[in-house]
Amino acid sequence: MTDSQNFESHTPMMQQYLKLKAEHPEILLFYRMGDFYELFFDDAKKASRLLDISLTKRGQSAGQPIPMAGVPHHAVENYLAKLVQLGESVAICEQIGDPATSKGPVERKVIRIVTPGTVTDEALLEERQDNLLAAIWQDKNGAFGYATLDITSGRFRVTEMPDSESMAAELQRTHPAELLYPETFESMALIERQQGLRRRPIWEFECETAKQQLNLQFGTRDLTGFGVENARLALCAAGCLLQYVKDTQRTGLPHIRSITMERPQDTIILDAATRRNLELTQNLAGGCDNTLASVLDLCVTPMGSRMLKRWIHTPLRQREQLIKRQDAISALQPLYFELQPFLRQVGDLERVLARLALRSARPRDLSRMRHAFQQYQDIHQVLDQADMPYIKELQQRISQFDELRELLENAIVETPPVLVRDGGVIASGYNAELDEWRALADGASDYLEKLEVREREKWGIDTLKVGFNGVHGYYIQVSRGQSNLVPMHYVRRQTLKNAERYIIPELKEYEDKVLTSKGKALAIEKMLYEELFEKLLPHLTALQTSAEALAETDVLANLAERAESLNYTRPELTEKTGIQITGGRHPVVEQVLSEPFISNPLQLAPQRRLLIITGPNMGGKSTYMRQAALITLLAYIGSFVPAEKAVIGPIDRIFTRVGASDDLASGRSTFMVEMTETANILHNATENSLVLMDEIGRGTSTYDGLSLAWACAENLANRIKAMTLFATHYFELTTLPEKLEGTANIHLDAVEHGETIAFMHSVQEGAASKSYGLAVAALAGVPKEVIRRAKQKLKELETLSGHSGASHVETSQLMLLADIEPSEVELALNKIDPDSLTPKQALELLYHLKELNK
């Protein structure tokens, strides 16, 4: 900020501002001035652009006009929410001195820093989504350490990733609101599209310092008990993250009590492409509609909703834990209708407790906590009906907190105001001294009514009335027409258009007494409110345990309701390799369709591990494949599944190579994206992986594409032996079952009726007889003359190739076109390697070809 030059030439107020701004150079500074938060210089210009607020000037300082923008203090949360959504951080600077006693500028201090990853105010958060702060570290060998913290719950997780591909998947899974990275970070391409990037000095990632910080936070001598002692890369990231939180929160963090190491071998691994293609919590357009979560998540608490989404993104491999969840869902099926109304009243206890820990809880947070405690007895009574060990385990974690409930019932009014400074938070009868001061203040209304009647009758002024405002205090108001009747001892305080306002010694004396009593009452309220924190915080650990158990109860009750309402069945998790599904349905598509969904079977086993899927476009191949993956994933979060019966063996990873588009930002063509995803599968799949391969090789020439598809299928069947669904339009691949053990053909059925086609969406054994491409083109609205011409060419090609239905290679096409002299454009096209072109080169070439064709 160039305006900080010639510091002494600035006004005292601007000098104070510049000192505070120098301490927070990279973030916006909201500087409190009266009823506004003001921004100056570059901050003002940036805020004006981002918030669409007026940019003005505040006189001059150091000979230059000062750019200025401001927001009203009562609306600041709305503006903070917008800035946080845009990935910005803000330092909040408040007046802490008394203007009446200050010489020079009122003393000010930055009291909190709001960043996208550390917000706790409910107005700034999406209530049904986790809001994570993350830190990333990379060593010289290319391995990564990664840490995440949800400050609204205290959930602190670390992991280590061997390469960029797995790190990319983890970034997509966690989707952090803010990401800290070292200034020397080399893999910027991995994170450059992340919002809320914060570059940090290299020394903040020092491992030994991290261990000291973490031991200090947890009150431990070492980290062995957390299982992270030797995870050096993860600790580097965790240390930076914890230091950042301490710097921004400027208070204790008692709700961050432990750190957990997440190991890839404990969960089913889903790479970034799979998470995207399966549309788990976000659809391909970036929204939330028509996703698995949109169907599965009817949780009645926000904390339950967030937990369910974590389950969806982290399917477990521990069969025992999954069976516990299944048992709990079965036990809750007859009880969820009775249980959910009580759970709904618990609300977002998890985030309320985080604000309590950070001492930022507002009166309504304590009211919500009280209301949650009042539901506990009813929740326990319902759960008592479920005679099932895992439910009993959850009940034990949900302590009743009767003493805390009684404390809050006695201390907090039924409907408290938003802020403590508004007064009226502490209930009457809780503190005798507070009641006395309130009685004095509240007696004002009776006194004022009597004064008004007395003065009106005494002086014969029927328009006389007594009032109060925040600027002038108490006053006696008389209409302009009767102002000549007021006695001499009335002192004029304010003149209005149609009235005069006066003060008398008696009223002034009473005003001082009332304002003193109100001030005393408010001071006592604030003290009592702080004392409530001291009484609640010793129970924080038990409260957090209880909130987590309630969230899990909500998730399980929700899954019980979904199973009942959507006709899901309990899957059998077996130790034998394979997937056997009878009457399987796509959980999302069946909810979108207006007509009944056609259910289909799936059999995968060691002796039937690769299925070649053929059939028409729009026949349902992609839906069938995704359906298999989603049913498997649901089984491995412990949910019931959309099927008549499902028996599912061990799964270590789910891969999808389904659909593709150009990645222009990275300079990758559709075919390059397709091959990159295919390479990832061939390198990392195992015999326990579920692999979905859709239309491999379609982005290149027929020979190249067919060869690649054939080789990939062989590799998956012979070397990897993964459970694979392989959809293709290359009919040559339907001969693979004759050559490869463990391979079979299935197809999606369709029936032609004259010029039209009916898609049966039914899976049948064997290969499809035709691709029905022209019928689909006609349905899509391709002009009839084009369809007629296409049919003619199809007959010619089929005559030359000697068969119909199979894909036709370039030789037959060249035979048809051999008598045609190639044009300049064709000659130029033959020299082009499309996969080596950048988007810019392709555009330039297009203009060149257009010129040749003139």
Swiss-Prot record:
A GO biological-process term: mismatch repair
Entry GO terms, CC: cytosol
Binding site for ATP: 615-622
Protein's name according to its UniProt entry: DNA mismatch repair protein MutS
Keyword set, alphabetical order: ATP-binding, DNA damage, DNA repair, DNA-binding, Nucleotide-binding
SMART domains named among the record's database cross-references: MUTSac, MUTSd
Source species of the chain: Proteus mirabilis (strain HI4320)
Gene Ontology MF annotations: ATP binding; ATP-dependent DNA damage sensor activity; damaged DNA binding; mismatched DNA binding
Functional description taken from the UniProt entry: This protein is involved in the repair of mismatches in DNA. It is possible that it carries out the mismatch recognition step. This protein has a weak ATPase activity.
Lineage: Bacteria, Pseudomonadati, Pseudomonadota, Gammaproteobacteria, Enterobacterales
UniProt-listed HAMAP family: MutS
Pfam families per UniProt: MutS_I, MutS_II, MutS_III, MutS_IV, MutS_V
InterPro entries xrefs: DNA_mismatch_repair_MutS, DNA_mismatch_repair_MutS-lik_N, DNA_mismatch_repair_MutS/MSH, DNA_mismatch_repair_MutS_C, DNA_mismatch_repair_MutS_clamp, DNA_mismatch_repair_MutS_core, DNA_mismatch_repair_MutS_N, DNA_mismatch_repair_MutS_sf
Gene: mutS
Domain of life: Bacteria
Family: Belongs to the DNA mismatch repair MutS family.
